Amino acid sequence: MRILVTNDDGIHAPGLKVLEEIARGLSDDVWVVAPETDQSGVSHSLSLNDPLRLRKVAETRFAVKGTPSDCVIMGVRHILKERGPDLVLSGVNRGQNVAEDVTYSGTVAGAMEGTILGVRSIALSQAYGAGGRAHVKWQTASHHGARTIRRILEAGIEPGILVNVNFPDCEPEAVEGIAVVAQGMRNQQLLAIDERVDGRGNPYFWLAFAKARFEPGHGTDLKAIAENRIAVTPLRLDLTDEPTLTRFAQALG
């Protein structure tokens, strides 16, 4: 099995190294095509107004000055064009990609692009807690990653479907199994703008998230990782809402 690995945190990210090790536990034919720099939050964007710069890092490792979607296209359509990958793995992201995160995530977009190109694709992310970005339990994704991927592949991924996997913020032995769950939704009142002033008196802004208690919905990715379970969520490329389609057809047709 030929595996193409990408991410959105960049070619030097620790999570990419973790995913390479996971991939090599599944196959000895692993190729890495990842962004030259951190592309977190770029979602499914493409570089349409700038050229893609390709740098060979090692025999089967490449860096692209572009987005995760650019990287997957470069891998499938150029680097591996003679024989394409059988599987695209995107991650392991530093931080969870659950609920509405999936609409912003470059990690999920890497798997989405693989799916568009007809390749089975899985996005993987490692949640972290109060300790912050400097205290990510990569060992949890490392320990459970290969087995989780194998089980997903054995179950089968249908065309047009990608799989989003989130590992909880706990030690590997504390994981309470796999939960196949729906995409959740947070309280968007927690999203805010943090206004600050620079040394010259000019205002600047950061996106911020307020600290507040929030009860995640039952059967969601948010609830699963809160309960120390590995959240596995199948996502569709087709964003059509069928009930509304039917209702609008009756109301507007």
Curated annotation (Swiss-Prot):
Pfam families: SurE (PF01975). Its cofactor is a divalent metal cation. Keywords: Cytoplasm, Hydrolase, Metal-binding, Nucleotide-binding. Its main location: cytoplasm. A divalent metal cation binds at residues 8-9, 40, 93. It catalyses: a ribonucleoside 5'-phosphate + H2O = a ribonucleoside + phosphate. It is found in: Cytoplasm. Its EC number is 3.1.3.5. It comes from the Bacteria. Binds 1 divalent metal cation per subunit. GO terms for cellular component: cytoplasm. The keyword Cytoplasm applies. One of its GO terms (molecular function) is 5'-nucleotidase activity. NCBIfam families: PRK00346.1-4, surE. Nucleotidase that shows phosphatase activity on nucleoside 5'-monophosphates. Belongs to the SurE nucleotidase family. This is 5'-nucleotidase SurE. The lineage of its organism: Bacteria, Pseudomonadati, Pseudomonadota, Alphaproteobacteria, Hyphomicrobiales. The gene is surE.
